[in-house]
């Protein structure tokens, strides 16, 4: 699984 900057950002939600 690759997590991009956006993925990490949305991960907070």
UniProtKB/Swiss-Prot annotation:
The keyword ATP-binding does not apply. This is Tachykinin-like peptide-XIV. The modification Pyrrolidone carboxylic acid is found at residue 1. Expressed by the venom gland. It comes from Phoneutria nigriventer. The modification Phenylalanine amide is found at residue 13. Keywords: Amidation, Pyrrolidone carboxylic acid, Secreted. It comes from the Eukaryota. Its main location: secreted. GO terms for cellular component: extracellular region. It is found in: Secreted. Belongs to the tachykinin family.
């Amino acid at each position: 699984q690759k997590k991009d900057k956006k993925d990490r950002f949305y991960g907070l939600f």
